[in-house]
Amino acid sequence: MAKTQRLDIVTPEKVVFSEEIDFVVAPGADGELGILPEHAPLVTALKVGTLRVQQGGKFFKVAVSGGFMEVKNSRIVVLADTAERADQIDVERAKAAKQRAEQRLNSKGSEIDVHRAEIALHKAINRIKAAE
């Protein structure tokens, strides 16, 4: 039987996922990281992106919006600001959020927080891509 590792994806609101998996690719702050069972211990920041998880020969995606990942003793803990399985993403809601962020960025008002609007746009695009 193939070796597996535990993956726990946790947000401030809930445990999104907590099961044995085969492999995960995570959006590390310095690039993507592939984690197999018995990986060397590691702690890294995560950027907005998509976790790609292989479990039992099948793949699924989880959209994350930053956080941290710890790998130790064939256990992976992802502490994410937000996390949403691709099959649970409301694509229409994500598209609406993308449109709102684009409208904010295109407006010329001084009350617009450009950095915040850019982050919102990036998160919305990530959710849409993860759901595809």
UniProtKB/Swiss-Prot annotation:
It holds the Pfam family ATP-synt_DE. One of its GO terms (cellular component) is proton-transporting ATP synthase complex. Keywords: ATP synthesis, Cell membrane, CF(1), Hydrogen ion transport, Ion transport, Membrane, Transport. InterPro entries: ATP_F1_dsu/esu_C_sf, ATP_synth_F1_dsu/esu, ATP_synth_F1_dsu/esu_N, ATP_synth_F1_esu_C, ATPsynth_dsu/esu_N. Disulfide bonds: none annotated. It is found in: Cell membrane. It is a peripheral membrane protein. GO terms for molecular function: ATP binding; proton-transporting ATP synthase activity, rotational mechanism. F-type ATPases have 2 components, CF(1) - the catalytic core - and CF(0) - the membrane proton channel. CF(1) has five subunits: alpha(3), beta(3), gamma(1), delta(1), epsilon(1). CF(0) has three main subunits: a, b and c. HAMAP family: ATP_synth_epsil_bac. Belongs to the ATPase epsilon chain family. Produces ATP from ADP in the presence of a proton gradient across the membrane. This is ATP synthase epsilon chain.
